[in-house]
């Protein structure tokens, strides 16, 4: 038997944000079993908490319904908030396949209500399949260069001219499935406030409510293309079109040639608890 909790990440009230199922004491579960459990839960991600291997507080494995991820934003933020309920520490170190991720926890009346994470610094390059992607999205152009960022998962960014245009998107998901091992992030906005939608048949997600691993790269993308200054925090609202509004905050410090830190933060709230009988 294994206990789990469902955290709605990047939300301050239940039934908003992006849910993640966090399974505790999972050292006895083989990876194939973790994958089957994640498929049974059928959330965008489930995480499994194991004993640490490299001096952190816990080792975390992350599974979508179809594959394991080396790093993901909302599942780790939700996991940190879930683990924070079992410790008085204000800082947690969670081991992942992309290294150890540091978290700062924010508490209110004794409960963890938010967390911030230092994300892996990504690499990026031009996508090189612009026409094919634009056709799959049903649009004619991107307001910024179409580039792909890699920080564990791979995120492609496509700019839309307005929030109305972003909300009106109806992509061809079958065509998007030809973009293997990547998520397509479409965004619009100005200044410090931006809206985003993420589509990724490759990761088993038709549309994601909150993509924390893309929030940091989006802040970098905006700074690189002159929309904000490096070090300036941005607010990213996602999930509106699917009824799961999710609010993320991101900041990229340094400069394009030498990034020093990528920070993503947000709230999280417990939706439910349960036990699986295996």
Swiss-Prot record:
It is an enzyme of class 5 (isomerase). SUPFAM superfamilies: Diaminopimelate epimerase-like. Its EC number is 5.3.3.17. GO terms for molecular function: trans-2,3-dihydro-3-hydroxy-anthranilate isomerase activity. Pathway: Antibiotic biosynthesis; phenazine biosynthesis. The keyword Isomerase applies. GO terms for cellular component: cytoplasm. The keyword Isomerase applies. Keywords: Antibiotic biosynthesis, Isomerase, Virulence. InterPro entries: Phenazine_PhzF-like. GO terms for biological process: phenazine biosynthetic process. It catalyses: (5S,6S)-6-amino-5-hydroxycyclohexa-1,3-diene-1-carboxyate = (1R,6S)-6-amino-5-oxocyclohex-2-ene-1-carboxylate. The active site is at residue 45. Homodimer. Isomerase that catalyzes the condensation of two molecules of trans-2,3-dihydro-3-hydroxyanthranilic acid (DHHA) into the phenazine ring system. The final product is not yet known. Belongs to the PhzF family. This is Trans-2,3-dihydro-3-hydroxyanthranilate isomerase. It comes from Pseudomonas fluorescens. The gene is phzF.
